[in-house]
Amino acid sequence: MFQKKAIVIDGKGHLLGRLASVVAKSLLSGQKIVVVRCEELNISGPLSRNKLKWADFLNLTMNTNHARGHRHGRSPSKIFWRAVRGMLPHKTPRGQAALDNMKVFEGVPAPYDKVKRVVVPSALRVVKLNTTRKYTVLSRLSQEVGWKYRAVVAKLEVQRKQRSSTYYRKAALVKAYRTQALKKFSA
């Protein structure tokens, strides 16, 4: 289903590849999508196996000059962005336009912390992955391969959750006072 406004997807608990395929399909239909909390995405398989696969990927270089070519994004948002790019015809104008309609973030930045976030049931780990199977959290893998900002993002997330809880406590109080006042004046 197509909406004019951007859909904000909370990446926590989703499997990376499954979410990337759903996002790519939606992008090709013209939908704008924002994925937040990419550091909480999951990859099936134990950390050791995923680290070995990433080590193979990081060894890709150019034959003539190793300093040029093959830039490997290590942040969770770049890893997810690249996974989606691999599912789009990104060398065509249509694919490039689709890729321009996507934004990815670690954590939940300011404009999107007040917006309703959705999940994709067909990509949730608890739905699609057997409970006995091991999985890797993307922030841990990123940290192991060179991402330096895991602690910073975690600290900012704690601050955001505190702000959010105080906001909702105040909103609940206002709602309670309003219902009290309505009861008082209606009687």
UniProtKB/Swiss-Prot annotation:
Listed SUPFAM superfamilies: Ribosomal protein L13
Any Gene Ontology CC annotation: cytosolic large ribosomal subunit
GO terms, molecular function: mRNA binding; structural constituent of ribosome
InterPro entries linked to this entry: Ribosomal_uL13, Ribosomal_uL13_CS, Ribosomal_uL13_euk/arc, Ribosomal_uL13_sf
UniProt KW keywords: Ribonucleoprotein, Ribosomal protein
Alphabetical list of CDD domains matching this protein: Ribosomal_L13
GO BP term, pick one: negative regulation of translation
NCBIfam families noted in UniProt: L13_A_E (TIGR01077)
Family: Belongs to the universal ribosomal protein uL13 family.
Protein name: Large ribosomal subunit protein uL13
Gene: rpl13a
